[in-house]
Regions:
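Inter-motif core of Ras-like GTPase G domains
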Residues: 67-87
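Beta-strand-loop-alpha "switch" segments that mediate conformational coupling across diverse proteins
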Residues: 121-168
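Structural beta-sheet core signal
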Residues: 58, 81, 117-119
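Conserved C-terminal guanine-recognition region of P-loop GTPase G domains, centered on the G4
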Residues: 93-109
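P-loop/Walker-type NTP enzyme "switch/lid" segment
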Residues: 1-57, 62, 161
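C-terminal boundary of histidine-terminating zinc-finger modules
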Residues: 158-185
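Catalytic P-loop NTPase motifs of RecA-like helicase/translocase cores
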Residues: 7-8, 63-65, 87-89, 103, ...
C-alpha cells in the first residue's frame, strides 16, 4: 500500500526525500518469487547488482506444505521461525522445525547452518506456566529459541502511517514512539549476533 499512500501524502513524500535524498542511499530491493525459485531469483539479482550485500532476507510461507518451501529452507544459511502460544500454530511450528532438523542430521552437506525459533505475538495475559512449559520442551529437544520475545500489539496488525507514527513499512524505519516496547530492535540485535554481522 505504501507507494499509493506516499503519492497522496505530502508529509510522507517529504520524509522520503529527507531519508534518501540527502544520503544518496536507495531503498532496499524487494523481489517477488515463488518458494521454488526464491534462491535463484536472489542469485540472479545479486549477480547483476553493483552493490555488495551482507544479508539477503527471505520471507517464506509458514508451512512446509507449500511447494518449494522445504527445499528453499534447507538451502538457506539460517532460518528464523516465529512461534506463538496458540496450540495448533505451535504444533505446526514444532513439526516444521523438527522435520528440518532431522533432514539436517541425515544430510550433512545442506547449506543450512541453523534454525532458530523466536516467540512472536506473545500475549502477556497468557499464563507464564504455558510459556515455561514450552520452553522446557524446547530445551529437552535441544531446539534453539532466541531470548527476545515479540509481544502481541495492535501496531503489528495495522499501520497508522497516514496520520500517525509509522511502524510497518518497507521504506521507512519504525518511528521511535512506535518501536517502544516492540522488542524488534532487540530481535534484530540478537539475529545480528548469531549471523556475526556486528
Amino acid at each position: 500500500w505504501e507507494v499509493g499512500n506516499i503519492e497522496k501524502n505530502v508529509h510522507l513524500q517529504n520524509q522520503l526525500v529527507e531519508q534518501f535524498g540527502a544520503s544518496g542511499r536507495k531503498a532496499y530491493s524487494i523481489l517477488n518469487s515463488t518458494p521454488e525459485e526464491a534462491r535463484e531469483t536472489a542469485g540472479r539479482f545479486l549477480e547483476k547488482s553493483e552493490l555488495d550485500y551482507d544479508l539477503v532476507l527471505f520471507d517464506l510461507p509458514g508451512t512446509v506444505n507449500v511447494p518449494g518451501v522445504f527445499q528453499s529452507v534447507i538451502n538457506m544459511d539460517y532460518v528464523f521461525t516465529p512461534i506463538t502460544q496458540e496450540r495448533m500454530a505451535m504444533r505446526s511450528s514444532m513439526s516444521f522445525v523438527l522435520a528440518i532438523r532431522e533432514y539436517m542430521h541425515r544430510h550433512k552437506d545442506v547449506p543450512l547452518r541453523g534454525i532458530h525459533m523466536f516467540w512472536n505475538r506473545m500475549d502477556k495475559r497468557v499464563s507464564k506456566d504455558l510459556y515455561n512449559g514450552y520452553t522446557e520442551i524446547f530445551r529437552s529437544l535441544k531446539l534453539p529459541v532466541l531470548e527476545t520475545v515479540i509481544p502481541s500489539a495492535e501496531r503489528y496488525k495495522k499501520d497508522s502511517g497516514m496520520k500517525g507514527p509509522l511502524f510497518r513499512s518497507t521504506l521507512f524505519p519504525p518511528s521511535s514512539s512506535a518501536m517502544k516496547g516492540s522488542s524488534l530492535d532487540l530481535l534484530a540485535a540478537e539475529i545480528e549476533t548469531i549471523l556475526k554481522l556486528q
